[in-house]
């Protein structure tokens, strides 16, 4: 699988990160969960894991595999707690649940509005706890994540306030059809590239929302499911100036994502346009900016 340098971290991440949220979305036995980790890390060579304390029991599910893979993965986790004291306690809990002493990347989780950014960057906000974590050797790098229509704009402002090492925000062909979102994303990507910031993009398969329909996937948005759709969506995303994309929380599409990543080739500009034009949004999802 192709690798790309994750900004200033110096780590060459595989273009797909293992989204460990998938481990917390099911009640599978530990042996099966171990096999999912093995599929991603050992069989497909993924060397970057994304996880968060809010992803169900994903940390407990991943912990048994960590001693066998820790020396070959870049481990990123997050805290969604906004204040310093709560964030520090949350970070300590993450280490305990994962059974590790440190991680490679510690991120502010779900910062999607200016109000949330104000909360975490104020005196005694969560960012202070993360900075102190770096000083104590708990993490090497600091990042910010978020999703929603304002995420690119918020993250661009965040980079003005603090020199984050990485960002993580949504991008997919369906989301890109939102012109306002596309414009703000391009500004963020340009700034990130100029300042050697690692770029991670989530929601690679998002095509719309559920509305009043009954979800048939574990994701809170409606994802692409077929191999052809996944190929088109992932290849489009990886043809943009990003570094890596975490896999989704729906276990049935994980093998297809890995398959697509192994066969990735950069799309031509014409193919990129076609990938966007072919998108069909059965139901809009304003929470991701999918409005047409």
Which ranges hold each PLM region?
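Conserved, mostly hydrophobic/aromatic
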Residues: 6, 18, 49, 62, ...
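Active-site groove signature of glycoside hydrolases
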Residues: 95-118
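Short, acidic/polar
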Residues: 27-41, 84-99, 149-159, 228-234
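Beta/alpha (TIM)-barrel catalytic core signal, keyed to glycine-rich beta->alpha loops juxtaposed to Asp/Glu
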Residues: 111-292
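Acidic (Asp/Glu)-rich catalytic clusters
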Residues: 7-12, 41-42, 62-71, 92-101, ...
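N-terminal binding-site loop/beta-alpha segment at the start of enzyme catalytic domains
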Residues: 1-73, 129
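A short, structured active-site edge motif that brings together acidic residues
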Residues: 72-83, 105-109, 169-173
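Acidic-and-aromatic substrate-binding clefts and catalytic sites of carbohydrate-active enzymes
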Residues: 24-29, 52-60, 80-87, 114-115, ...
């Amino acid at each position: 699988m192709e690798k790309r340098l994750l900004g200033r971290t110096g780590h060459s991440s595989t273009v797909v990160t293992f989204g460990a949220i998938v481990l917390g979305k099911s009640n599978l036995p530990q042996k099966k969960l171990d096999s999912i980790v093995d599929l991603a890390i050992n069989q497909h060579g993924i060397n970057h894991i994304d996880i968060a304390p809010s992803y169900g029991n994903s940390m407990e599910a991943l912990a048994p595999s960590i001693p066998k893979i820790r020396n070959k993965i870049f481990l990123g986790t997050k805290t969604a707690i906004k204040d310093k004291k709560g964030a520090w306690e949350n970070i300590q809990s993450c280490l305990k649940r994962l059974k590790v002493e440190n991680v490679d990347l510690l991120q502010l989780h779900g910062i999607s509005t200016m109000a949330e950014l104000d909360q975490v960057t104020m005196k005694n906000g969560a960012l202070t706890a993360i900075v102190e974590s770096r000083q104590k050797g708990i993490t090497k790098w600091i990042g910010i994540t978020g999703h929603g229509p304002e995420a690119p704009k918020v993250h661009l402002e965040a980079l003005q306030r603090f020199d984050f090492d990485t960002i993580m925000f949504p991008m997919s062909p369906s989301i890109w059809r939102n012109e306002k979102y596309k414009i703000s994303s391009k500004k963020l990507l340009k700034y990130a590239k100029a300042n050697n910031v690692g770029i991670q993009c989530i929601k690679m398969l998002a095509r719309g929302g559920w509305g009043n329909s009954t979800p048939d996937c574990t994701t809170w948005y409606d994802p692409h499911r077929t191999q052809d759709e996944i190929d088109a969506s992932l290849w489009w995303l990886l043809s943009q100036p990003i570094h890596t994309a975490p896999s989704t929380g729906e276990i049935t599409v994980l093998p297809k994502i890995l398959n697509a990543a192994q066969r990735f080739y950069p799309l031509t500009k014409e193919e990129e346009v076609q990938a966007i034009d072919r998108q069909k949004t059965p139901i809009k999802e304003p929470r991701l900016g999918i409005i047409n």
